[in-house]
Amino acid sequence: MSEEVPQQFPSSKRQLHPSLSSMKPPLVAPGEYHRFDAAETRGGGAVADQVVSDAIVIKSTLKRKTDLVNQIVEVNELNTGVLQTPVSGKGGKAKKTSRSAKSNKSGTLASGSNAGSPGNNFAQAGTCRYDSSLGLLTKKFINLIKQAEDGILDLNKAADTLEVQKRRIYDITNVLEGIGLIEKTLKNRIQWKGLDVSKPGETIESIANLQDEVQNLAAEEARLDDQIRESQERLTSLSEDENNKRLLFVTENDIKNLPCFQNKTLIAVKAPHGTTLEVPDPDEAGGYQRRYRIILRSTMGPIDVYLVSQFEESFEDIPQADEPSNVPDEPSNVPDVPSNLPSTSGLPENHDVSMPMKEESTERNMETQEVDDTQRVYSDIESHDFVDGIMKIVPPDLDMGVDYWFRSEVGEVSITDMWPDESGPDWNQMITFDQDHAGPSDNKILEQPQTPSSPTPEESTATRSPTGS
C-alpha cells in the first residue's frame, strides 16, 4: 500500500475529487474527513480506487500542514531574533537584508500572529517602549518623592529603585529644578518645594475640608449682607423721618471738641465737583514772614469758604498795626526826613520800612502788594465783624487775573512780568477808594504800595502835610 502511493502521486493532481476543488478552507483537520459513497457497496475494485484517491488527498493535506508548521517555526525564530540584544560592532557586521525580505518577514509575522489576538506583537512592542519612556519614569520618580521621609529623596536610591541609569534621573531632576518644583539640599539629594504633593487619602480629606470652608464662608457672607441691609434701612428711616429732620445738624462745639481739630485753624469749603485745591508752601517766597494761602478753582459753580475755628497762634508772626516792625532798615538813598512831621496813620516813625522794597524790582513790588492783601484779609477776620459761630470768608476785591504763583523757575521771572497788561487796574484809584472806607489799621497796608521808588523830600512833605492838618 505504501509502495503504490508514490507511484500514483503525480497523477493525483488530475484525479482530485470535485468536492475538494473548492477554495473554501477546511472546517476541521483533513484527517477527520470521511466519505460514504454508494459505490462502496459495489465491487472491490471500485473501493480500492476510492481508497487510493482518499490516501492521495490526505497526503497532500499533510504536506500543507507541514509547510504551515515550518512557517510557524520561522516566525518564532524571527521573534526571538528581534527581541535579542543587538550584536556589538566588534563581533562582526550583520548581514543586510533587502526590503522585500523584510516585507516578507513582516507579512509572515502578521499571518502567524493571527492564531491569537491580531495586535499582540504591536501592543507588546508599544508597551515596552512606554515602560522606558521619560514620562512614565517621571511619574514613578514623583511617587518616590511622595513616599520619601520629610520629602527628601536620595537620587542614588531612586536610580536603584527604578532600575535606570543615573543620567535618566538627572534629566528629570534638571527639568523639575528648572521650573521650580524641587531644590537640591545636599549632594544627590533633592527636596520638593513646588505644589503640595499629598497622598490620595489626604487629597480626599482636603477636598472635603475645602467644601466645608466654602459653606461656612457662604453663611458668613449671607449674615453680613443681612446686617448691611438692616443698617441701610435704619439710616433711611432716620433721614426720612420728619421728626428727625430737625435734629440732623452738628454744632460748632461738636466740631471743635474733636481731638483731631484741637489747636488748629479749621476752614470748611463748600464747592462743586471738580474743584481744585492748592496750598502753596508758606516758605516758598523766602521772606521774613510766612504766608499761608489756599487757592480754590472751579468752573462748575460758586465756592463757599467758612472759618469754623481759628487758632490763636496762627497769625502771631504777622505784625499788628500798633507794633513796630523788627526788620532792619535797608540802606537807601532817601534823605533824612524831619521827625516832627505829622503822621495821621498813627504808626511809628519807621513805618516806611515795615515792608522791604527795592527800587527797580517789579517782582518784589508784586510780592509786597500780595502781603498787604493777605494782611487785609487777616485784619478783616480779626475785626469787630468776627462773631461767634461760623463765618463766611469772602476774597478781597482785587484783580484775580494777576499771576503770582505760576512763575518760571529759571530767573524767577513771573508770567505777568513777561506779558505786562497795560490796561491793568489803576492802583491809585483803588487806594483812594479803600482810604475812604478803611479803618486806621488799613492805612498802613494801603500806603505801602504808593512808594515803589524812593521819594524825594519834597514829595514826602507834599504827601504828608495835607493829612497832618
Curated annotation (Swiss-Prot):
User: What is the annotated tissue distribution of the protein whose record heads this document?
Assistant: Expressed in proliferating cells and several differentiated tissues. Detected in inflorescence and shoot apical meristems, cotyledonary vascular tissues, leaf primordia, young leaves, base of trichomes, central cylinder and elongation zone of roots, lateral root primordia, flowers, pistils of immature flowers and pollen grains.
**What is its induction behaviour?**
Up-regulated by light and by auxin. May be up-regulated by E2FA.
Task: List, as start-end ranges, the regions of compositional bias called Polar residues.
Answer: 8-22, 100-118
Per the record, the GO terms for biological process are:
positive regulation of cell population proliferation; positive regulation of DNA-templated transcription; positive regulation of meiotic cell cycle; regulation of cell cycle; regulation of cell division; regulation of transcription by RNA polymerase II; response to auxin; trichome morphogenesis
Which residue ranges are recorded for the region named Leucine-zipper? 210-238
Gene3D superfamilies recorded: 6.10.250.540, Winged helix-like DNA-binding domain superfamily/Winged helix DNA-binding domain
Query: According to its UniProt record, where is this protein located?
Result: Cytoplasm; Nucleus
**Composition skew (Low complexity), residue ranges:** 447-469
Question: Which stretches are tagged as biased composition: Basic and acidic residues?
Answer: 349-374
What CDD domains does this protein's entry cite?
A: E2F_DD
Q: Which GO terms describe its molecular function?
A: DNA binding; DNA-binding transcription factor activity; protein dimerization activity; RNA polymerase II cis-regulatory region sequence-specific DNA binding
Ranges for the region named Disordered are 1-28, 84-118, 319-374, 426-469
On modification after translation, the UniProt record reads: Phosphorylated.
* Record keywords, A-Z: Activator, Cell cycle, Coiled coil, Cytoplasm, DNA-binding, Nucleus, Transcription, Transcription regulation
Q: Which family does it belong to?
A: Belongs to the E2F/DP family.
Q: What does this protein do?
A: Transcription activator that binds DNA cooperatively with DP proteins through the E2 recognition site, 5'-TTTC[CG]CGC-3' found in the promoter region of a number of genes whose products are involved in cell cycle regulation or in DNA replication. The binding of retinoblastoma-related proteins represses transactivation. Involved in the control of cell-cycle progression from G1 to S phase and from G2 to M phase. Stimulates cell proliferation and delays differentiation. Represses cell enlargement and endoreduplication in auxin-free conditions.
Q: How does it assemble?
A: Heterodimer with DP proteins. Interacts (via dimerization domain) preferentially with DPA, but also with DPB. Interacts with PURA1 and retinoblastoma-related protein RBR1. Component of a DREAM-like complex which modulates a variety of developmentally regulated genes and of the mitotic genes in proliferating and differentiated cells. Interacts with MYB3R4 only at early stages of leaves development.
* Protein's recorded name: Transcription factor E2FB
**Species name for this entry?**
Arabidopsis thaliana (Mouse-ear cress)
Give the gene that encodes this protein. Answer: E2FB
